[in-house]
Amino acid sequence: MPVLALLIAYLVGSIPSAYLVGRANGIDLRTVGSGNLGATNVLRTLGWKPGLFVYVADMLKGFLPVLLLPRFAGVAAGWPWGVAFGMLAIAGHVRPVFLRGKGGGKGVATASGVFLALAPIPFVCATGAFIIVAVVTKYASLGSLVGALVLPIAVVLQERALTPLVLVSGLVSAFVFWTHRENIVRLRQGNERRISLPGQRA
């Protein structure tokens, strides 16, 4: 049963929320904007309401497997199974099987959902940092990177020991930086696109 639950976690993560919203609006988001199937590209291309919808949907792809699959599989929540379900959901989001393993998002929203289930207080800290930086600078990528830095720090302060959750948060943070490597280059060059506030178009 745990093996089946692992597969379910990956399949849930693979649901291409941004792709489906784009298709519902008559476009393939892989061919417009940044080409990324994430909430930021939806925000820039279709506006803040579809962008918010995709962000919440992608976050739930991480939250629900961690919350529900341990009960389904008859295993303990948290470490190691809850974490494994969450990591596979993130992997599915970045490399979705329904799109043949290509064209996924960068994992930020899904990772947020994972840590909402595993560590709510660090989640709030990281999300707060993301929102503040993104609103002030209008760079969603910079907000994601700052949030990724804050997450393991907040987990360390919560755990007060080198627990598996600390290690996982560090790995997730490093993974977010890896998926944003092109954004980092554009930020350094001053070529990164800004997001728009609600009521505006990118």
Residue positions per predicted region:
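N-terminal signal-anchor transmembrane alpha helix
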Residues: 1-24
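Nucleotide and nucleotide-moiety/phosphate-recognizing core
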Residues: 5, 50-56, 60-99, 118-125, ...
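Alpha-helical transmembrane segments of multi-pass membrane proteins
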Residues: 9-14, 70, 88-93, 130-134, ...
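C-terminal ends of transmembrane helices
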Residues: 18, 23, 90-101, 130-137, ...
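Cytosolic, membrane-interface loops and tails of multi-pass inner-membrane proteins
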Residues: 21-49, 103-104, 183-202
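Short, non-helical or kinked segments that cap or interrupt transmembrane helices
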Residues: 28-39, 99-112, 139-147
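Interfacial segments of multi-pass membrane proteins
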Residues: 43-47, 69-73, 92, 106-137, ...
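Loop-to-transmembrane alpha-helix initiation sites
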Residues: 124-126, 140-148, 161-172
